[in-house]
Design a protein with these regions (language model features):
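N-terminal Sec-pathway targeting helices
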Residues: 4-15
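A short, well-structured edge-of-sheet supersecondary motif
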Residues: 58-88, 339-340, 346-350
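Active-site SXXK
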Residues: 77, 94-120, 143, 203-207, ...
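Short, charged, amphipathic alpha-helices and their helix-cap/turn boundaries
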Residues: 78-83, 159-188, 219-241
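Active-site helix/loop module of the DD-peptidase/beta-lactamase fold
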Residues: 95, 113-153, 182, 212-255
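Active-site Gly/Thr loop motif
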Residues: 174, 238-245, 293-348
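Active-site-proximal alpha-helical segments within enzyme catalytic domains
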Residues: 199-207, 255-276, 337-353
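Structured C-terminal helix/loop/strand segments within mature extracytoplasmic catalytic/sensor domains
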Residues: 328-377
Length: 377
């Protein structure tokens, strides 16, 4: 069978969900995986291969970029560079941390497309719908834009005082959504940006309650897992993806979904292609456009995803507004997890590792230098 015909058949199978881990372009390296410590690079017209290899070497070998564990770069749907640190390989699952938020946003979009949720209706949280509760004004749009107005601290000093840590690891951990949904308002919904992992757990609960009325943790877990598998994991061929749940059966949709580097790249490609796989629309283009449109209170944040836009004075730069195209966007997670997508360059870059957040800037800058080596269309 000639290579072109094989390529078309693989794409057709991907579109039907019948093709597991090969659902997206592994063809640039013919399905081969880089051995630990080795960089696999495909020559790309207009890209200086030696310079690309050198910059990737720095990312893995120089102390200021430690600890990079995996890198995958896709261009035009094909893997053009891939590398793993010793002890890791293409089968290794990596924790998402906050990259999970963007997965949760996609699940919300599927629910909206199905007519089960509405973006600007009051968020269907029963406790908020009691007469006189001001939280009844919170909408899905507010939650996706991190502007619910709920009282929240994402990072505290000491850390165990933060609402995020309390929900994930301390007094809220067994029923995370009860902790998250139980917070009072501290601002009018829609009036300010407040980055919140707890908000994504609220969205996870809202999705789950559209799937089942049961409060049984196992039933809730199964309902969400089946929905994710049928609508996202299998169509995208992300066979390694493992969502994590708390003791009450709620998806930890703000921080704990695991997948290997190639599957995270498939997720980025899915968004780069506006929710389409091989010409088949699995998520509406309008929803992806919503995710990639600046929120009112922070232009660098969309619908549960970061955008390559300047921020207000005093706020830290998130991506590369002075270096890369304005349509760049990224799912980012604690300790240096990145899925960075540049539609103008037909690129998706995944970097996974463990770098403390207070020394992460050099890693982020190095990823920008790598992306800048690729031409724009």
């Amino acid at each position: 069978m000639e290579a072109g015909m094989k390529h078309r058949i693989l794409l057709a199978l991907a579109a039907t969900g019948l093709l597991g881990a090969t659902a997206f372009g592994l063809y640039g390296i013919e399905g081969r995986a880089a051995d630990s410590g080795e960089t696999m690079i495909v020559d790309v017209p207009g890209v200086p291969t030696a310079a690309l290899n050198a910059e990737i070497d720095k990312l893995f070998n120089e102390d200021e970029f430690a600890e990079t564990r995996a890198l995958v770069i896709m261009r035009g749907g094909e893997i053009v560079a891939e590398r793993y640190a010793p002890g890791y390989d293409r089968g290794t699952r990596f924790i998402s941390w906050s990259m999970a938020k963007s997965v949760t946003a996609v699940l919300v979009g599927l629910m909206v497309a199905d007519g089960r949720l509405a973006l600007d209706a009051p968020a269907p949280v029963p406790d908020w719908q009691r007469p006189g509760d001001p939280r009844g004004a919170i909408t899905l749009r507010h939650l996706l834009h991190m502007s619910s107005g709920l009282q929240h601290s994402e990072a505290g000093d000491p850390p165990y005082d933060s609402d995020e840590v309390r929900m994930l690891f301390l007094d809220g951990r067994d029923n995370m959504v009860r902790y998250a949904e139980g917070q009072p308002l501290e601002a009018e919904p829609g009036s300010k940006f407040e980055y919140s992992t707890n908000t994504s757990v609220i969205l996870s609960d809202i999705i789950t309650r559209q799937l089942t009325d049961s409060k049984d943790p196992d039933v809730r877990r199964r309902a969400m897992l089946e929905y994710m598998r049928g609508r996202l994991i299998e169509p995208l061929g992300m066979a390694s993806m493992v969502p994590e749940f708390d003791a009450s059966g709620t998806l930890i949709g703000g921080s704990i979904i695991q997948a290997n580097a190639r599957d995270w790249a498939k997720f980025g490609e899915f968004l780069r292609n506006k929710g389409s796989i091989a010409g088949n629309q699995f998520l509406t283009r309008g929803w992806v456009d919503f995710m990639l449109t600046s929120s009112p209170n922070d232009p660098a944040y969309g619908g549960h995803i970061w955008l390559n836009k300047p921020r207000a004075a005093g706020l830290k730069k998130v991506l590369y507004p002075d270096l890369l195209p304005g349509d760049v966007f990224a799912a980012q997670g604690h300790l240096g997890q990145f899925v960075i997508v540049s539609p103008s360059q037909k690129l998706t870059l995944v970097r996974l590792g463990k770098t403390q957040d207070d020394v992460l800037d050099p890693v982020k800058e190095q990823l920008g230098r790598i992306l800048a080596l690729f031409p724009r269309d």
